[in-house]
Amino acid sequence: MKISVPISLNTLEHCHRDSLLKRLSQLGAEEVLLCYAALGFDAFVEEERAASIIKEYDAFLKGHGFQTAVWASTLGAFAHSGYTPLTTINGKPLTLWACPMDAGFGKAFCRVIEKIAALGIGKIVLEDDFRMQCCEGDISCFCEQHMKFYSEYLGRAVTREEMKEGLFDSAPNQYREAWMAGCRKGLEDLARQIRASADEVNKNLSFVLCCGPALFGGDGTDPEALRNFLSGDNAPAQLRLIGAPYWSVFNNPLNAVIDFPRRQAFECSKAGIECYGEGDPYPRPRYTCSATEVEFYHTVLLADGHCDRLFKYGCDYTSSFDYEKGYAERAEENRELYAQIKEMFHGKKCVGFHPLEPFDKVKRAHRLAMAPEHAVMDTALRRYTSSLSLPTAFEKGGVNLIFGENARCVECEDLKYGAVLDMAAAMILQERGIDVGIEKTVKHTPGETGHGLPVYDETYFEEKEVVGLYGKPVSCLDLVLKAGAKEESKLHIIDRDYTGSYTYENADGRRFLIYNFDMDEMVKTSGWVRSYCRQAQLARLYPWLNGSPVDAICLGNPDLYLLAKKDDNSLAIGLWNYSKDKISNPVVQLGRRYATIKIVGGEGRLEGDKIVLTTQIKAYEFCFIEVTK
C-alpha cells in the first residue's frame, strides 16, 4: 500500500526542509499532496504566492524522488463570493457552499483547474466538499435553479413545501426521484466541465476525487460515475475513500468505522478503480486523535488488501514539521510490522459474516432521513459487527447480516447462505413474500422503565444465561411463530414475556436467526447487542445457518476487532484490541484443525481446532496469526 502525505502550502512558507524530508521519510511517503484551498474564503495564501510555492516545492520534492499532486477545495471554497449558495429544503442558504448548478461558479472553478494544470502539475486531488449533502444543515439543494429543475422534471410547478412533504413520504416517489436527479445533474455536469478544462491544458492530467459520505446515494450519483466523468483518455481518475481515524473523535468507534472504507475499497477493487484510504487524524495534533488510531486504520486496510494507497496525514496543517512528530515516529516504528502483515495476508480472501448494506439504499428506503448521508456513515450494522467482534467479508458466501431497510435490496438467491435479521428486516421480507416463520404479530409497546434500571432482561436458553437490558422503552412484537420455528431466547419486559430471538428454516431451505427488535433502535444500548451471549449465540448457530463453520471467532472480549483471510492452504487472522482493557490469553475458535502456527505480536499454540494465546493483547495493541494445514 503506497503512502501519500498531504502538506498545507502555508506550512511551506517558512519550513525547515530537512524536517520536512525527515517526516516524509518516517511516514514512508512516495507521493506528496500540496494542499491549496483554491481562491476561497479560507485560502491559506493568496493566489500568486500559492502558484509560486507550488512550482518551487513541486520541483524540490520531485528532485528528492517524490511524486507530487495539488489538492484543491471545490464547492466549499467559494464562501461569500456572490455565487448561488446551496440552499436547504427549509430555504436556508448555506453561505459556505456554492451550488454546482451556478454557471459562474463552474467557470471560476475550472479556471482554477486550468491554472494549476499550467504549472506542470500532473495530478489534482479534489476535496471531499465535492458534494451537496452533509454540509451545514438539512438536505440540499433547493435554490431557484434547482427548484426550476424539479418543476421541469415533474412537469408542473412545485414549491419547497410540496417537495418537503413529498420527499419525506413513507416510500420512494416522484419527488425523491426529482431531488436525486437534480443533485446528480449538478455534480455530474461540473465533473464534465472540470475534465474538459483540464484537457485544454493537459490531456494526461489525472484527478483523485475525495469521496464524501453523501456520494453514496445521498447525492443521487455515486463515486464510480463521477470518477468516470473525471477520467481522461489516458488518465483514469482515482478515488479517495471516506471514513477516517478522526471519526472516532466524534463518538464513532473506529472498530465500527473501519468496515465502511473496507467495503468501498472492495467495490473499487471489483471495478478496477485505484483507491486511497483516508488516514486522517483531523484535527491534529495527537491531543485530539492518537497515532494509535491512525495505525489501527492503516494496519486493518493493509491486512484487508483492497486499498491501493493511503493518504497518511502525518503533518500538521498549521504548525512546523517539528511540532507534531508522533504520527511519523509511530509509522517509522511499524515499518517492519507493515511488511509482516503484507506477507501474512497477501493473496488471501476475506472470510466471515456478509454485511448486506447497499450504498444506494437512500434511493430505495421507505424512511428518508433529514440527513440521508447518515444512512451510510454510522449504521446499526457496523455497530453490530464491531460490538460482537465478527469477522466480515464483502464477497458473498458468509451468513448474511440484514437489518432494517437493507432487506428491500437483498436478492432472494443470496439467502441460501443463511441470514441474521432484525424484526424490521423480517417484516420487509415477509411483505416480499418470503417466509420468515411468523404466523401472526401483535405490536406491543411497554410503558416507561423508570430510571434506566434493567427491568428488561433476556434469557438465552442454550447459553443458560440471563442478560440485563438497559435503556429506553422499546417496541416489540408479540409473535405467534409457525411450526418448526425454535425460540432461542426470551425477553422479559416489565411484566410480560416475548420471543427474544428465534431460528427458522422455510420450505425453500432458507435458514434465519431473527431478533424481535429493531437494530437501529437498540444497537447502541447495553445488553441488547453488546452482549457475550449474543456473540456466543451467533458463533453456535453459524454452522446451522450457513452449512459450514465460521473460519475464526474470538469470544468474550469487548471491542476486539477481528479480520480473517484464507487461501487453499492457510488462514491469516488479525486481532486488534480497541478496548481500554487488556485481553489475557484469548482463544480463537477455528473452523477446522491446522498443523502449524506463526504469530506476530504475541505467543501461543494450536490446541485442536483452537488457537490459545499465552500472552496478553494490551489495550490498543494488535496481534497477527497465520495457521497452515
Q: Which residues fall in each region the model found?
A:
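The substrate-binding groove and active-site-proximal loops of carbohydrate-active enzymes
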Residues: I3-L12, A38-A51, G91-C110, A171-E188, ...
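Short, acidic/polar
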Residues: N10-Q26, A103-I116, T221-F229, S290-L301
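Aromatic-lined substrate-binding rim segments of carbohydrate-active enzymes
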Residues: L20-L21, A37-T88, L190-A198
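Hydrophobic targeting/anchoring helices
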Residues: C35, G122, E127, Q133-C134, ...
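A conserved amphipathic helix/loop scaffold
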Residues: E373-M377, F394, L401-I625
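Catalytic domains of carbohydrate-active enzymes, especially glycoside hydrolases
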Residues: C15-G40, K115-K123, A235-L239, Y297-R309, ...
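Aromatic-lined carbohydrate-recognition surfaces of secreted/lumenal glycan-active proteins
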Residues: M1-L12, Q67-T74, V125-D129, Q174-D222, ...
